[in-house]
A protein has these predicted regions:
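Conserved Switch II/interswitch segment of TRAFAC-class P-loop GTPases
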Residues: 123-144, 168-170, 174
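Walker A/P-loop
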Residues: 54
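P-loop/Walker-type NTP enzyme "switch/lid" segment
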Residues: 45-51, 59-122, 141, 198-210
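Conserved C-terminal guanine-recognition region of P-loop GTPase G domains, centered on the G4
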Residues: 140-156, 165
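Well-ordered beta-strand positions
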Residues: 106, 124-128, 161, 187
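Beta-strand-loop-alpha "switch" segments that mediate conformational coupling across diverse proteins
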Residues: 166-173, 178-211, 223
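Extreme N-terminal, non-catalytic leader segments
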Residues: 2-46
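NTP-binding/hydrolysis catalytic cores, primarily Walker-type P-loop NTPases
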Residues: 210-243
C-alpha cells in the first residue's frame, strides 16, 4: 500500500478505510482492476445534490467493516467533498486503485450530481441515493432514463438500487414520498431506510464517523442493517444480478 494511503488509515484510525481522489484515469483503472482482482465497485449516485450521498459513502465503509467486508471509498466528485472532509490527495490513480483492489472486497465511489456517465458505466452496481421529498420523486423518471441508457451502452450492465436517506416517519410528506417511490420502483427500493438522525450530520461536519461518536444511534443501526442487506464481498455473485 502506498505511504499516503497508510497515513490516511492511521489518521482516521479505521482499519480498511481509504479515501482517494483521482481524475481521468479512474474508469480505465477500475475496469482493469475488476477484471484482474474481482473487486466489487459500487457507485453512489444522485441526480440532485444535498441528499446525503457523501456522508453515507463515508460511513458505509465502517458499516461494511462491522460485517467483515473489507471496504474502501474513493472520491470522483468534482467538488471533492469526501476528500476535503477526510483529507487525502492521490498521486497515481492507477497505482492507488490497484493497491485498493488487492486489499479490499468492495470499493465505494462517491460521485457528483448529476453522476458522470463513465462511472455509471464502469460500476458493478449503483446505489441511487434519494431523500423522501418532492424533488427526489420528481427526478425518478429522469434518473431511470439515465440508468437505462447506461445499461444499454455498458458491458457490465450495472444494477441500480435506490436508497432512501433522511426519512422521518413522523412527517406525512416523507411517508407519502416513500410510498410513491416504492410504487414506481419496487422492488429496486432497498428495504432498509436510513432514518433522519442529527448524529450523522454532526459526525460528518466533525470529520468523524458516526459509529465512533454515536454508536448507539438510530442511524448506526440503519447503516449496519443496510450493510447486511447489500451483502457485497469478494466472491459475491455479482455477474448474476438482474433487474
Amino acid at each position: 500500500m502506498t505511504p499516503d494511503v497508510r497515513n490516511l488509515l492511521r489518521h482516521l484510525r479505521v482499519p480498511g478505510l481509504a479515501y482517494r481522489d483521482f481524475g481521468a484515469a479512474a474508469p480505465g483503472s477500475i475496469r482493469r482492476t475488476q477484471q484482474r482482482q474481482g473487486l466489487v465497485t459500487v457507485g453512489l449516485v444522485s441526480l440532485v445534490a444535498g441528499v446525503g450521498r457523501t456522508a453515507l459513502c463515508a460511513n458505509l465503509v465502517r458499516a461494511f467493516a462491522q460485517q467483515g467486508t473489507r471496504a474502501g471509498a474513493i472520491d470522483v466528485d468534482p467538488q471533492g467533498t469526501l476528500t476535503a472532509m477526510f483529507g487525502a490527495e492521490g498521486r497515481d490513480p492507477s497505482t492507488c486503485i490497484e493497491h485498493l483492489a488487492l486489499e479490499r472486497d468492495v470499493l465505494l465511489v462517491d460521485t457528483g450530481s448529476p453522476p458522470p456517465t463513465d462511472v455509471l458505466s464502469e460500476a458493478d452496481e449503483l446505489l441511487v441515493v434519494a431523500r423522501p421529498d418532492a424533488a427526489s420523486v420528481a427526478a425518478v423518471g429522469q434518473m431511470e432514463d439515465l440508468l437505462v441508457r447506461t445499461r444499454m451502452r455498458s458491458w457490465r450492465k450495472p444494477r441500480a438500487r435506490w436508497l432512501i436517506n433522511a426519512f422521518d416517519g413522523r412527517r406525512r410528506a416523507d411517508r407519502e414520498a416513500l410510498a410513491a417511490m416504492r410504487r414506481a420502483l419496487r422492488p429496486r427500493v432497498l428495504a432498509t431506510v436510513v432514518q433522519e438522525d442529527r448524529a450523522l450530520h454532526d459526525a460528518f461536519l466533525a470529520r468523524r464517523l458516526v459509529h465512533d461518536v454515536a454508536p448507539g444511534s438510530q442511524v448506526v443501526a440503519d447503516l449496519d442493517a443496510l450493510a447486511r442487506e447489500l451483502h457485497w464481498g469478494r466472491g459475491s455473485e455479482r455477474h448474476a444480478w438482474v433487474d
